[in-house]
């Protein structure tokens, strides 16, 4: 721990001491001010904010013990106090999900799968409420998505999708997280064993 905070300005500034309560503040403004080619590919302000909020939601689900807040245009949009996992899941996904969700905690060898999975009555038209974490890291993985889809195959029909917040824990040597620059894709050493 340090007796004070530090500030680093991305405008070419040096690291300097700053006053701050305990925690971390990340502020982004004019990110592509000097790269107009990148700036022209940005979506609308509301779409870009929604992407930032989704990143916060994923981090908050992965770490319910940490408080999070997000602001936009000088106003606070979301504030989450540290909480247990159940409370955090309710805050992030909503009150409708929680009564339909069932806790699960299963182990097989060195694998452990835990989290919340919604009953078929809470199926979704999209994949907006599917959160899969591997060793605490949010991932989008075709293998895991397929395994989850198969688990609901006999009870979900048509274009409906299950809702879940699932955590897969395994030996870090059994998964390569350096597959995608954003670290949202992984490669498993024993993909068939994971899928079962």
Language model features with spans:
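N-terminal phosphate-binding caps/lids of nucleotide- and nucleic-acid-binding domains
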Residues: 1-196
């Amino acid at each position: 721990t340090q007796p004070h905070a530090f500030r680093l300005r991305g405008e070419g500034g040096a690291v300097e001491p700053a006053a701050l309560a305990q925690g971390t503040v990340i502020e982004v403004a004019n990110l592509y001010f000097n790269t107009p080619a990148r700036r022209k590919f940005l979506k609308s302000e509301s779409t870009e904010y929604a992407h930032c909020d989704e990143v916060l939601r994923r981090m908050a689900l992965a770490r319910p013990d940490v408080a999070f807040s997000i602001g936009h245009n000088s106003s606070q949009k979301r504030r989450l106090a540290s909480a247990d996992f159940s409370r955090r899941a309710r805050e992030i996904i909503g009150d409708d999900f929680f009564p339909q969700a069932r806790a699960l905690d299963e182990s097989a060898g060195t694998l452990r799968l835990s989290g919340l999975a919604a009953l078929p009555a809470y199926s979704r038209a999209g994949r907006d409420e599917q959160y899969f974490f591997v060793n605490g890291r949010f991932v989008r993985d075709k293998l895991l998505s397929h395994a989850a889809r198969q688990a609901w195959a006999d009870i979900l029909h048509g274009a409906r999708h299950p809702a879940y917040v699932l955590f897969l824990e395994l030996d870090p040597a059994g998964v390569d997280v350096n597959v995608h620059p954003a670290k949202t894709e992984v490669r498993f050493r024993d993909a068939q064993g994971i899928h079962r």
